[in-house]
From Swiss-Prot:
The keyword Glycosyltransferase does not apply. It comes from Pseudomonas aeruginosa (strain LESB58). GO terms for cellular component: cytosol. This is Glutamate--cysteine ligase. One of its GO terms (molecular function) is ATP binding. Its EC number is 6.3.2.2. HAMAP family: Glu_cys_ligase. It catalyses: L-cysteine + L-glutamate + ATP = gamma-L-glutamyl-L-cysteine + ADP + phosphate + H(+). The gene is gshA. Keywords: ATP-binding, Glutathione biosynthesis, Ligase, Nucleotide-binding.
Length: 527
């Protein structure tokens, strides 16, 4: 164990401080496509019975009208987070009217690009802005790529913990800056070690052959309708032939919060010639919010983000600049197609131990390690189960299995501390399950997906539809209690009323609204 990690764990293990570890906050966002009874993309509007996608706090859409997004409230116990997520699934399933929630991350058979419906948010200015932003994504990256679904894991350490560490370490930074620097250090370590999550939880080794739209790739054919890589863990997180040159130079290495903010500010205000050629309007219709490298900060694609809850009308980068980092959002997790929620308690508890390990371990600046971190991540998503696979650690080759076992040995200390804080051995058990996967790659979700498809002679689509139907049956057999169902019905109707009120009471025209939105980031830069 590193000196810094051991010192911090000893400090938090003291009787007076141990309860702090029960105050970490969790939230999960799960995306999933709606499909029809044949497993084709649902072309129906977002079900009105689920409420307004603009104003509902827990049920919205991501890119497409058919790409649902379920958002849990924050909880200190991740078991409560998963219970929240299950309630949302049960309610949504009860309103789908013959449609299913698609079980894996990679999409079903998709119609042609033009027919994939972009999510709609009504006629309010903010609703229209969200729609035009998505039109811009279609223009820049194509609609097909936007139909990939994932799980986002939001995690924060208790606010009371940072002053304790700051004082113990004699830091001269302000409390806010110390906290931000600590989260950025967590993110640097996440970049170093997130390949391990791809090995353990990657669950997208195969996809529907039509997804590539005929483009050449390194993928092999499993059957007439399925492409795969034999040792892949997460094709979702690989490049899959998508190279967006505009974002190529955008690689913040997270040396400090300010440099991260500056790189995003620059990207959302720097014109990109190919986008300038298109312009923001065609035939008088908006096609993208601006012609810059990024339309808004959230367009930047990354496996983890520093976050701060925003105020109404505030942009993410404004919130970070004004109040510092509050939590991290892990964005690289595949949906496990064998699980009704796409994630379970073992995975969540391991993630907690992993993120605490990243937060408390020494985290030097990445600098030269940046390219190694990227290369390791890409190697594992494409061939993580290849026997003897070598990764790069501080410029030296190391076998994945050796490095993974060393990391799990160190993460065991944070898992043990979490168990001491909460009682029981749940985190140690979650860690043991991951050790078993390192010892035997056949136990990983990616290997299990290929094993089942081969044993049953199923295409990716057939496997996924069967899993989707099984999960629908699970939710049907576990309906919400009447009181819970009524609470969700009210949330849906309240959100519709809120959207109606927003549309009725707004002032101003859309062009002025977009100009003001753009000016908010330009104002930040000039300050």
């Amino acid at each position: 164990m590193s000196d810094l990690l051991s010192r911090r764990l000893a400090l938090l293990g003291a009787a007076a401080n141990l309860p702090l570890l029960t105050e970490c906050l969790h939230g999960i966002e799960r995306e999933c496509l709606r499909v029809d009874s044949d497993g084709k993309l649902a072309l129906t509007p977002h079900p009105r019975a689920l409420g307004s996608t603009l104003t509902h706090p827990q049920i919205t859409t991501d890119y497409s009208e058919a790409l649902l997004e379920f958002i849990t409230p924050t909880e200190t116990d991740v078991a409560d987070t998963l219970a929240d997520l299950e309630r949302i699934h049960r309610f949504a399933s009860s309103k789908l009217d013959g449609e299913y929630l698609w079980s894996p991350s990679m999409p079903c058979e998709l119609p042609d690009e033009e027919s994939i419906p972009i999510a709609r948010y009504g006629s309010s200015l903010i609703g229209r802005l969200k729609y035009v932003y998505r039109k811009g994504l279609a223009l820049r990256y194509g609609k097909t790529m936007q139909c990939i679904a994932g799980i986002h894991y939001n995690f924060s350490l208790p606010e009371r913990l940072w002053p304790l560490l700051r004082q113990a370490e004699g830091s001269e930074l302000s409390e806010r800056d110390y906290q931000s620097a600590a989260y950025i250090a967590l993110i640097r370590n996440f970049r170093r070690y997130s390949w391990l999550l791809m090995y353990l939880f990657g669950a997208s080794p195969a996809l529907d052959a039509g997804f590539l739209r005929g483009r050449p790739s390194q993928l092999e054919r499993l059957d007439e309708h399925t492409l795969y890589l034999p040792y892949a863990t997460s094709l979702r997180m690989s490049d899959l032939g998508y190279q967006n040159n505009a974002q190529a130079g955008l690689t913040p290495c997270y040396n400090d919060l300010q440099s991260y903010i500056d790189s995003l500010r620059q990207a959302v205000s720097t014109p990109y010639p190919p986008y300038e050629k298109v312009g923001t309007k065609q035939d008088g219709e908006w096609v993208q919010l601006n012609t810059n490298i990024l339309q808004i900060e959230n367009e930047y694609y990354s496996s983890i983000r520093p976050k701060r809850v925003t105020y109404t009308g505030e942009r993410p980068v404004q919130a970070l600049a004004a109040r510092g980092v509050q939590y991290v959002e892990v964005r690289c997790l595949d949906i496990n197609p064998f699980l009704p929620l796409g994630i379970d308690l073992d995975e969540a508890r391991f993630l907690d131990a992993f993120l605490l390990f990243c937060a408390f371990s020494d985290s030097p600046l990445l600098n030269g390690e940046c390219s190694d971190a990227t290369d390791n991540f890409l190697a594992v998503v494409k061939e993580g189960r290849r026997p003897g696979l070598q990764l790069q650690r501080r410029g030296q080759p190391v076998e994945l299995q050796v490095w993974a076992n060393e990391l799990l040995e160190r993460i065991a200390d944070t898992a043990a501390l979490l168990d001491r804080a909460r009682g029981g051995e749940a985190h140690a058990a979650a860690l043991a399950a991951q050790r078993a996967k390192v010892a035997d790659a056949e136990l990983t979700p990616s290997a299990q997906v290929l094993k089942v498809m081969r044993e049953r002679g199923e295409s990716f689509e057939a496997f996924s539809l069967r899993q989707s139907r099984e999960h629908a049956e699970y939710f049907r057999q576990h309906p919400l209690a009447a009181e819970e169902q009524a609470r969700f019905e009210k949330m849906a109707s309240d959100s519709l009323a809120e959207q109606t009120e927003l549309e009725r009471d707004q002032d101003g025209d859309f062009d002025t609204f977009v100009a003001a939105y753009q000016a908010s980031i330009l104002g930040l830069i000039s300050n």
